Amino acid sequence: MAIKLEDKKAIVAEVNEAAKAALSAVVADARGVTVGAMTGLRKEAREAGVYVKVVRNTLLKRAVEGTQFDVLNDVFKGPTLIAFSNEHPGAAARIFREFAKGQDKFEIKAAAFEGQFLAANQIDVLASLPTYDEAVSQLMSVIQGATSKLARTLAAIRDQKEAAAA
């Protein structure tokens, strides 16, 4: 089915805007995945602030041109499903990784983060990045641990001085 030039320009502009606003991108091949499963994937992605779209490769190459995601141009072969993470860099990678576990035919091709190409076997690195809330929680636990250790040390010094004075 042929797409009119105006429609192609609109698709390129839409995907380009999504790419400019995104923190990371993940590319997958969704051949053979049922419509119901894809609908579930899109719903989950929407809830996580991830933009998901199936785009023709030539249009996708034009859309990511000049963005940090043009490193993905070599993997735009065959049916391409692209996901841009807008709120957290690992969101799309996590969603795709979990979805791939239940779908035999769903294949993650690659990802890009901060202009760096990540092969399919490196997706776990991106997916394992902590969310903002998780990172703050980890930082607070480190600070709390250091504060507790300092308080115990000061109490031990005080007790030692009191024992020496008595």
From Swiss-Prot:
Pfam families (UniProt xref): Ribosomal_L10
GO biological process, one term: translation
Example of a GO cellular component annotation carried by this entry: cytosolic large ribosomal subunit
GO MF terms, alphabetically ordered: large ribosomal subunit rRNA binding; structural constituent of ribosome
InterPro entries: Ribosomal_uL10, Ribosomal_uL10-like_sf, Ribosomal_uL10_bac, Ribosomal_uL10_bac_type, Ribosomal_uL10_CS_bac
Keywords: Ribonucleoprotein, Ribosomal protein, RNA-binding, rRNA-binding
Family: Belongs to the universal ribosomal protein uL10 family.
Function field: Forms part of the ribosomal stalk, playing a central role in the interaction of the ribosome with GTP-bound translation factors.
Oligomeric and partner information: Part of the ribosomal stalk of the 50S ribosomal subunit. The N-terminus interacts with L11 and the large rRNA to form the base of the stalk. The C-terminus forms an elongated spine to which L12 dimers bind in a sequential fashion forming a multimeric L10(L12)X complex.
Name by which UniProt lists this protein: Large ribosomal subunit protein uL10
Organism per entry: Pseudomonas aeruginosa (strain ATCC 15692 / DSM 22644 / CIP 104116 / JCM 14847 / LMG 12228 / 1C / PRS 101 / PAO1)
Lineage, uppermost ranks: Bacteria, Pseudomonadati, Pseudomonadota, Gammaproteobacteria, Pseudomonadales
